[in-house]
């Protein structure tokens, strides 16, 4: 990634995080923008989100993000339009890194316990 695309991705990550925090219902799961990857021509921004909640809440949150993509892009446009001629199209993808890290931690804890019992 070039320096420009990295800066654009960082700005989009900050602004999307703020928008999601203010615009989405507070009673639902916690949604965090983990990373934003943007194409070289700045036309598409892929936002990877971490959703902390039950599997049903995660599915509902992703569906909500997909439904509200246009309105989120419109809000984003009003906040950053002075930086860009054209606001990139948004795509939301679920990031499962937190869940994988948690599972690995559980496995390591199990290994530690079994090795402590064998000693």
Swiss-Prot record:
<dbReference type="InterPro" id="IPR000238">
    <property type="entry name" value="RbfA"/>
</dbReference>
<dbReference type="InterPro" id="IPR015946">
    <property type="entry name" value="KH_dom-like_a/b"/>
</dbReference>
<dbReference type="GO" id="GO:0030490">
    <property type="term" value="P:maturation of SSU-rRNA"/>
</dbReference>
<comment type="similarity">
    <text>Belongs to the RbfA family.</text>
</comment>
<keyword id="KW-0690">Ribosome biogenesis</keyword>
<dbReference type="Pfam" id="PF02033">
    <property type="entry name" value="RBFA"/>
</dbReference>
<comment type="function">
    <text>One of several proteins that assist in the late maturation steps of the functional core of the 30S ribosomal subunit. Associates with free 30S ribosomal subunits (but not with 30S subunits that are part of 70S ribosomes or polysomes). Required for efficient processing of 16S rRNA. May interact with the 5'-terminal helix region of 16S rRNA.</text>
</comment>
<protein>
    <recommendedName>
        <fullName>Ribosome-binding factor A</fullName>
    </recommendedName>
</protein>
<dbReference type="InterPro" id="IPR023799">
    <property type="entry name" value="RbfA_dom_sf"/>
</dbReference>
<dbReference type="GO" id="GO:0005829">
    <property type="term" value="C:cytosol"/>
</dbReference>
<comment type="subunit">
    <text>Monomer. Binds 30S ribosomal subunits, but not 50S ribosomal subunits or 70S ribosomes.</text>
</comment>
<keyword id="KW-0963">Cytoplasm</keyword>
<dbReference type="GO" id="GO:0043024">
    <property type="term" value="F:ribosomal small subunit binding"/>
</dbReference>
